[in-house]
């Protein structure tokens, strides 16, 4: 039976206005829209009155419910029938954890009520198209139609393909029908294999073969034999990449054989809880570094949010599934798309060439895709610290005549670093009889054929197959699985995981054969043991779907009880679906139909399938000299600063959590003005050391339109000039991931790919001492479509994205572009040696040109010398600022340094040649360094010792004030105010934020950037930062116990435990499942902290599901009430813990006036480094800190304080319960965005009880308790940041 329950309004006023504006622009007479959530409960038994009231209370969250009866035509948008939304999974979990076992499933839709004039059927279709994502949602016209969401279908049996009867044609037909993308020789191979087996193949076997042997999974082109211009080539592409490892194997622990590569890390104190006692402690051991970079291009073109989200999720799983289990740590993301053409902000170089119907626009991709990638990382609890963004779409001359080159098929890059124990780097042995396990969520009928689909050029496959190949994301589920993996690796030698892989392309049909084959075994499986929420799925759909957040593992049979215990505690679903066999054979039994859908020798599936040969011709690029007429430097500056590749990226940065883990030493945002210009990302290796890890990106894809090899060399060079900004030491410590994107088969591109791989793998990297132990290729970077009567193609440039990773010697010595105005000198190190090439530059692009000669690595020895020299200067502390030269050239390098330093520039480019345009806008490799004037001679001497004397040019100095002036020989070349440049540079991000977020907030932020008087972040402390008020109590040896409380989806508990640990507490890991099961109680604890994250993925309101699981369980409710009423206890709630505890007001004495925390005014997750003031309040944790103003990490989507009315707010204030407020950089309490990131009235962001024993706050003090983890800080701070005082106050209060 289904019950329908109304929910809160689903759209804010500005979202409704945006929708109405879109309808008006489409000339649709829609006058008014009201939207509210509707909940559907699928019940297995009726609810009594109390249970019904409980369900209603559970589903009451967010803004107040509307009291009026909605007017207008109903359009009900729900998840597609046959799928289960992540919302449903988590909401159902909450209902069950609150004791409502009669609820089979909860699902949610949005009821739109449309008031409109007379609309035709076609116009109504336009309206519905605006209101739902056809890839994930459907539209009903009555609430009762939602019954279809819970319809159960009968299982369907496997289908046989009549090869023996119909011969080869049966395989050809199946290939087309199922979208298998099989090549002719693969069809021959299968015909031969099944003829020898004497039986017909089943559809599931063909599908499994297609996925396992797709280009996406098998990398056939990189393993192919090559004939170029009639000449046999000696090596495959992959062998040339492997040559870098053969030449420089130093520091690499695992390459080419696992889900990620591993290199040596540092010996540090890894901090985690003991399995038996739950007590957190440091464990001195090597934290080796793993690295991986994936792409998820095809799904992102079809449906950007889930495409980018599952791209990030898949890469995170790759990291977690390395060795015998590892810990993902920090991420990077990148996008290459065609021109944005922002409505009302179209740029002169942006022409509309059309696109295929089934893919979305570049603007849609950059509106939704980054949000999807960020949301997954945020909810999983991984900071996203690095990235790139390129737009390119142009008609260019080539040997094929004029052709369209650009990124209609986008690049969506997802990568990152993690850590792994030394003993777990290599996978274990799979014993015969080992249990084969799927860890994670249920099988769903989604993501079918993603491996094969992504191996085709967009436009080749059927639209329904594109539709089927898009996946769905549930990061909170992946977090639960990762917690299980963490518990396993933390057991050391007792780790129950023998072997682990993630489930990606091809689903279990690829993952399970790979698992057993890599372990030297076969496998025997039972189809019906696979967790599935859709009983009507066919065997093919169950085995081959790409439902996300799943891992496959081999676990020794005797370790299964331990594994079961860990999964139950973390509430991570798992299923044992088979066992390993001695015979290298794959069999899949179907208990329902008592048949064998799969019965194959493994070598048929994974054996020597036909090897590809690429027989190709070289076509040299055809460039035209840059036409200069009409180009002025002033116009060029404005255009280049508007090019998205160059322009400010704030709209891509602040949506991503950059402080979670408490181990982020360098994020994108630099300095007191928080400008997104960092050279590289840096994390600390642990919570107790200054060793670390660095990541940087390099890519120069447009150059490939002129010179394939130069483009590849520049990508390596740029990654190197970016990562050089931190203290690494020997260049052999740097390891690279190479992600290759090409339109294989396009005339000239294959030979160009070979040329590029050879340039990097055989020549440049070996000469530099660099290794490429990991990478990925995507060989179908082309879209085809019909535009009117014309066939069109959009082909991406050959695109190599290099991600560089390294161990860092001391994270404190990371140099940023932030300029100082002390007596200084700016030096340009020009590795272009005066070539100043303008081909394929940002300058050329903004004038719709390509040019002829591009930049290149001019001298490999000098590039190596450059890296060594910068490392020497970093170690000697000689550099004040550093920024590499890249897109936009020297002009942009200097401008970004000035923005970060909020200062002027007095530059002289007389020594850079007579061509001023080329001097300012060439994109040859190099960097600008700032040194003290007194150090200039010594610095130039170091550079000369490294062979760079002829590359060094004095180009002026940073000065106080707002003028940005470039001269040559006494003549002004360019002069403008820095503020004006800053505003131009920011206009793209402003326009994107206006489109995507609350436009009022976007306007406020943009306006703030034009204020030259802004003093930036600053600190005013009312206490001695170096005083340890806890020291006398720690000296007694007594360590009070603090319960570090987490719920499923919480992700900030480890850094919270570490902060309390440092203050003299015994931090104990307590999961809500421990309390609900009675394994742990709160009676032994002196303090309790509820940690941040996304409990239940913020479903049913941020923190509200967590709170209700306490309130609706009598025993646990009593336990919390007793704790809060007990004198001599302290409690802290941070972020999600704050939201949760604000919903426990009925249990916490003195909290009656506490507010609720609701959606930010921006309607967006906000990750900021915000200034707050400690106000006079009873809070025991903030004693002695009143009046202090200091920055703190903020990361939340629902942090805005909501009070009932003005009287409620006045009472909260008059009682003195407000503990922290947001202030602007002038020290004034503020409601203005982004200084106040959530729009809370009077800047309120923390409150306390009348006794001061319980304090809740939205910002994250635990993430910045170490100075080194602050995005910016005064130079005189030591190891401890000022927020460490909160934790020491806690220890002091407990005596």
From Swiss-Prot:
Gene Ontology terms, MF aspect: ATP binding; metal ion binding; phosphoribosylformylglycinamidine synthase activity
Catalytic residues in the record: 1135, 1260, 1262
Highest taxon of the lineage: Bacteria
SUPFAM superfamilies to which the protein is assigned, alphabetical: Class I glutamine amidotransferase-like, FGAM synthase PurL, linker domain, PurM C-terminal domain-like, PurM N-terminal domain-like, PurS-like
Location of region: Disordered: 305-327
Keywords, ordered alphabetically: ATP-binding, Cytoplasm, Glutamine amidotransferase, Ligase, Magnesium, Metal-binding, Nucleotide-binding, Purine biosynthesis
Catalytic activity: N(2)-formyl-N(1)-(5-phospho-beta-D-ribosyl)glycinamide + L-glutamine + ATP + H2O = 2-formamido-N(1)-(5-O-phospho-beta-D-ribosyl)acetamidine + L-glutamate + ADP + phosphate + H(+)
Domain Glutamine amidotransferase type-1 residue range list: 1042-1295
CDD domains: GATase1_FGAR_AT, PurL_repeat1
E.C. numbers: 6.3.5.3
Binding site for ATP: 307-318, 678, 886
Pathway: Purine metabolism; IMP biosynthesis via de novo pathway; 5-amino-1-(5-phospho-D-ribosyl)imidazole from N(2)-formyl-N(1)-(5-phospho-D-ribosyl)glycinamide: step 1/2
One record GO biological process: 'de novo' IMP biosynthetic process
A GO CC term assigned to this protein in UniProt: cytoplasm
Sequence positions that bind Mg(2+): 718, 722, 884
Top enzyme category: ligase
Function per UniProt: Phosphoribosylformylglycinamidine synthase involved in the purines biosynthetic pathway. Catalyzes the ATP-dependent conversion of formylglycinamide ribonucleotide (FGAR) and glutamine to yield formylglycinamidine ribonucleotide (FGAM) and glutamate.
Family stated for the protein in its record: In the N-terminal section; belongs to the FGAMS family.
Protein name listed in UniProt: Phosphoribosylformylglycinamidine synthase
Organism: Escherichia coli O157:H7
């Amino acid at each position: 039976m289904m019950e329908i329950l109304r929910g809160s309004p689903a759209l804010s006023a500005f979202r409704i206005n945006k929708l109405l504006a879109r309808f008006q622009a489409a000339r649709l007479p829609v006058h008014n829209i009201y939207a509210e959530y509707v909940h559907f409960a699928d019940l297995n038994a009726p609810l009594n009155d109390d249970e019904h009231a409980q369900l209603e209370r559970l589903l009451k969250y967010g803004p107040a419910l509307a009291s009026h009866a909605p007017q207008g035509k109903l359009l009900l948008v729900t998840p597609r029938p046959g799928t289960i939304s992540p919302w449903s999974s988590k909401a159902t979990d909450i209902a069950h954890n609150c004791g409502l076992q009669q609820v089979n499933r909860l699902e949610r839709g949005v009821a739109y009520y449309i008031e409109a004039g007379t609309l035709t059927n076609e116009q109504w279709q336009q309206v519905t198209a605006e209101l739902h994502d056809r890839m994930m949602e459907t539209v009903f016209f009555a609430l009762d139609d939602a019954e279809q969401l819970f319809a159960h279908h009968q299982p369907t049996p496997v289908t046989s393909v009549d090869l023996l009867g119909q011969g080869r044609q049966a395989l050809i037909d199946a290939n087309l029908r199922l979208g298998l993308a099989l090549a002719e020789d693969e069809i021959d191979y299968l015909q031969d294999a099944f003829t020898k087996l004497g039986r017909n193949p089943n559809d599931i076997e063909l599908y499994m073969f297609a996925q396992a042997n797709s280009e996406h999974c098998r990398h056939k082109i990189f393993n192919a034999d090559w004939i170029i211009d009639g000449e046999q080539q000696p090596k495959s592409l992959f062998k040339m990449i492997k040559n870098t490892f053969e030449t420089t194997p130093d520091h690499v622990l695992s390459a080419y054989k696992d889900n990620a590569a591993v290199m040596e890390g540092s010996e540090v104190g890894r901090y985690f809880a003991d399995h038996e006692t739950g007590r957190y402690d440091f464990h001195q051991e090597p934290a080796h570094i793993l690295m991986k970079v994936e792409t998820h291009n095809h799904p992102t073109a079809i449906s950007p949010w889930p495409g980018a989200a599952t791209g990030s999720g898949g890469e995170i799983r790759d990291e977690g599934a390395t060795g015998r289990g590892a810990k993902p740590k920090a991420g990077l993301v990148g996008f290459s798309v065609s021109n944005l053409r922002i409505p009302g902000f179209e740029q002169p170089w942006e022409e509309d060439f059309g696109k295929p119907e089934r893919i979305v626009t570049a603007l849609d991709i950059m509106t939704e895709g980054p949000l999807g990638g960020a949301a997954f990382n945020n909810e999983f609890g991984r900071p996203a610290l690095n990235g790139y963004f390129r737009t390119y779409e142009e008609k260019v001359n080539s040997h094929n005549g004029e052709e369209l080159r650009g990124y209609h098929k986008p690049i969506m890059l997802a990568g990152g670093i993690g850590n792994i124990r030394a003993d777990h780097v290599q996978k274990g042995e799979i014993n015969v009889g080992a249990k084969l396990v799927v860890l994670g969520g249920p099988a769903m009928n989604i993501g079918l054929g993603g491996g094969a689909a992504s191996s085709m050029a967009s436009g080749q496959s059927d639209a329904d197959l594109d539709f089927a190949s898009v996946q769905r994301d549930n990061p909170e589920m992946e977090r639960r699985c990762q917690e299980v993996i963490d518990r396993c690796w933390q057991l050391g030698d007792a780790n129950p995981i023998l072997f682990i892989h993630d489930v990606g392309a091809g689903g279990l049909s690829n993952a399970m054969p790979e698992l057993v084959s890599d372990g030297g075994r076969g496998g025997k499986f039972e189809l019906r043991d696979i967790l599935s929420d859709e009983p009507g799925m066919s065997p093919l759909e169950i085995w081959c779907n790409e439902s996300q957040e799943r891992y496959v593992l081999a676990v020794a049979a005797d370790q299964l009880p331990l594994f079961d215990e860990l999964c139950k505690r973390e509430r991570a679903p798992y299923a044992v679906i088979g066992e390993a066999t001695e015979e290298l054979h794959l069999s899949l039994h179907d208990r329902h139909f008592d048949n064998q859908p799969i019965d194959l020798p493994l070598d048929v599936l994974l054996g020597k399938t036909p090897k590809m040969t690429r027989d190709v011709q070289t076509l040299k690029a055809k460039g035209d000299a840059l036409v200069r007429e009409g180009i002025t430097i002033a116009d060029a500056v404005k255009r280049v600063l508007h090019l998205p590749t160059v322009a400010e990226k704030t709209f891509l940065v602040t949506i991503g959590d950059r402080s979670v883990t408490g181990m982020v030493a360098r994020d994108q945002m630099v300095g007191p003005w928080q400008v997104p210009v960092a050279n590289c990302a840096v994390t600390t290796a642990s919570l107790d050391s200054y060793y670390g890890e660095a990541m940087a990106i390099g890519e120069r894809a447009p150059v490939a339109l002129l010179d394939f090899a130069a483009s590849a060399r520049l990508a390596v060079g740029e990654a190197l000039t970016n990562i050089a900004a931190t203290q690494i030491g020997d260049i052999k410590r740097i390891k690279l991931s190479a992600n290759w994107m090409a339109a294989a088969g396009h005339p000239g591109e294959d030979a160009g790919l070979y040329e590029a791989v050879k340039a990097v793998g055989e020549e440049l990297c070996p000469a530099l001492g660099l290794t490429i132990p990991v990478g990925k290729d995507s060989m179908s970077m082309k879209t085809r479509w019909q535009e009117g009567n014309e066939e069109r193609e959009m082909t991406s440039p050959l695109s190599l994205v290099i991600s560089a990773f390294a161990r860092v010697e001391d994270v404190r010595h990371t140099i940023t572009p932030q300029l100082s105005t002390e007596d200084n000198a700016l030096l340009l190190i020009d590795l272009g040696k005066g070539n100043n090439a303008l081909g394929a530059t940002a300058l050329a692009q903004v004038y719709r040109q390509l040019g002829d000669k591009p930049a290149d690595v001019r001298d490999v020895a000098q590039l190596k010398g450059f890296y060594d020299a910068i490392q020497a200067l970093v170690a000697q502390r000689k550099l004040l600022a550093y920024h590499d030269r890249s897109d936009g050239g020297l002009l942009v390098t200097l401008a970004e340094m000035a923005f970060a330093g909020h200062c002027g520039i007095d530059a002289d480019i007389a020594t850079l040649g007579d061509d001023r345009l080329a001097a300012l806008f060439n994109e040859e490799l190099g960097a600008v360094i700032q040194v003290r004037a007194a150090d200039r001679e010594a610095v130039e001497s170091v550079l000369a010792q490294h062979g760079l004397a002829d590359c060094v040019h004095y180009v002026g100095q940073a000065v106080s004030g707002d003028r940005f002036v470039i001269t040559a020989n006494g003549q002004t070349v360019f002069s403008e105010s820095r503020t004006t440049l800053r505003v131009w540079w920011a206009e793209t991000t402003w326009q994107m934020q206006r489109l995507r977020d609350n436009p009022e907030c976007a306007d406020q932020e943009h306006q703030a950037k034009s204020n030259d008087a802004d003093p930036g972040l600053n600190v005013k402390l009312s206490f001695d930062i170096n005083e340890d008020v806890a020291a006398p109590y720690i000296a007694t040896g007594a360590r009070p116990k603090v319960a570090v409380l987490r719920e499923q989806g919480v992700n900030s508990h480890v850094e919270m435990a570490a902060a309390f640990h440092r203050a003299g507490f015994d931090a104990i890991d307590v999961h809500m499942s421990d309390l609900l099961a009675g394994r742990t109680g709160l009676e032994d604890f002196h303090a309790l902290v509820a940690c941040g994250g996304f409990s239940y993925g913020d479903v049913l309101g941020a923190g509200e599901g967590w709170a209700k699981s306490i309130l609706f369980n009598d025993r646990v409710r009593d336990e919390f009430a007793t704790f809060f009423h007990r004198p001599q206890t302290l409690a802290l709630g941070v972020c999600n813990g704050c939201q949760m505890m604000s919903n426990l007001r009925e249990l916490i004495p003195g909290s009656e006036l506490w507010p609720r925390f609701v959606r930010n005014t921006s309607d967006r997750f906000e990750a900021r480094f915000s200034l707050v003031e400690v106000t006079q309040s009873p809070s025991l944790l903030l004693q002695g800190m009143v009046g202090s103003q200091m920055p703190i990490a903020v990361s939340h989507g629902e942090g805005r304080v909501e009070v009932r009315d003005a009287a409620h707010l006045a009472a909260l204030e008059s009682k003195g319960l407000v503990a922290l407020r947001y202030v602007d950089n002038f020290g004034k309490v503020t409601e203005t965005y982004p200084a106040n990131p959530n729009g809370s009235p009077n800047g309120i962001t923390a409150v306390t009880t009348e006794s001061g024993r319980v304090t809740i706050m939205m910002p994250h003090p635990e993430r910045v308790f170490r100075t080194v983890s602050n995005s910016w800080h005064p130079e005189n701070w030591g190891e401890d940041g000022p927020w460490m005082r909160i934790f020491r106050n806690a220890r002091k209060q407990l005596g």
